[in-house]
């Protein structure tokens, strides 16, 4: 069949649109306990709330007759595919997640996964970032993935250490100013 006669939505079940940066070869999908809880809560909400609502809308719209020009039906089916894709994605990511509690390093001056690190360099001055899992990093919030170049450069450094960060513009020298971890929770 010629591709000219297919709908653009024929490939809607591909998970390409939800792909996050791949894990490094042999790498693990590290995630903080709070990040794991957020992803799990999103998955359960999709399964228990969002998907059933859309299924009801699609069922109601399908009962209205002609589906080819039924906006509620067409939009509902599209939304259902999006939800199913996100459910598959979250399920896969949670299955391979390795929960790492950064509070176990509370009081340490060495940079490990989950650390909030303040570093300085000659170009940007001081900057604070938190090293998180791939699925929970958000650069707008100062959270970087543990596989990012800056996190890789800082991991295992101690307060006062100077590390090198290779960049396209040359090597930058970063000095670790402060390392913080969340406090240990009373278990």
Q: Where in this protein do the model-derived segments appear?
A:
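Juxtamembrane/interface motifs at transmembrane-helix termini
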Residues: 58-59, 91-96, 148-149, 185
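Hydrophobic residues in alpha-helical segments
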Residues: 62-65, 94, 154
């Amino acid at each position: 069949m010629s591709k000219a006669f297919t709908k653009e939505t024929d490939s809607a079940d591909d998970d390409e649109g939800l792909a996050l940066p791949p894990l490094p070869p042999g790498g693990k999908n590290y995630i903080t306990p709070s990040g794991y809880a957020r992803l799990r809560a999103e998955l359960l909400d999709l399964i228990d709330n969002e998907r059933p609502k859309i299924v009801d809308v699609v069922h109601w719209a399908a009962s209205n007759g002609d589906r080819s020009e039924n906006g509620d039906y067409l939009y509902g089916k599209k939304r259902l595919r999006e939800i199913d894709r996100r459910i598959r994605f979250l399920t896969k990511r949670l299955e391979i997640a390795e929960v790492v509690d950064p509070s176990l390093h509370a009081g340490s001056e060495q940079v490990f996964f989950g650390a909030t690190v303040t570093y300085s360099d000659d170009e940007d001055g001081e900057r604070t970032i938190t090293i998180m899992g791939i699925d929970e990093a958000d650069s707008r919030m100062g959270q970087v993935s543990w596989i990012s170049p800056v996190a890789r450069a800082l991991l295992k450094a101690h307060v006062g250490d100077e590390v090198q960060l290779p960049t396209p513009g040359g090597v930058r020298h970063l000095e670790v100013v402060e390392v913080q971890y969340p406090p240990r929770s009373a278990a």
